[in-house]
From Swiss-Prot:
The gene is PIGY. PREY and PIGY, 2 apparently unrelated proteins, are respectively the product of an upstream and a downstream ORF contained in a single bicistronic transcript. It is linked to Hyperphosphatasia with impaired intellectual development syndrome 6: An autosomal recessive, multisystem disorder characterized by severe developmental delay, dysmorphism, seizures, cataracts, and early death in some patients. This is Phosphatidylinositol N-acetylglucosaminyltransferase subunit Y. Residues 27-44 are lumenal. It is a multi-pass membrane protein. Residues 1-3, 66-71 are cytoplasmic.
Amino acid sequence: MFLSLPTLTVLIPLVSLAGLFYSASVEENFPQGCTSTASLCFYSLLLPITIPVYVFFHLWTWMGIKLFRHN
């Protein structure tokens, strides 16, 4: 049973955000170690947030173009 594209488009960013909030609440030194852009930790948190957001808006734009073209 596969989930549809609109469901995955909403579900993946929400799961990624929930994972970030979970790791922020569990890890004791989360804010101290990940605020500097020179640290690798900053980018290891930035990529899991950026990629689902990019995919969401890319698919949203693509679906909008498809719907505009067919109406």
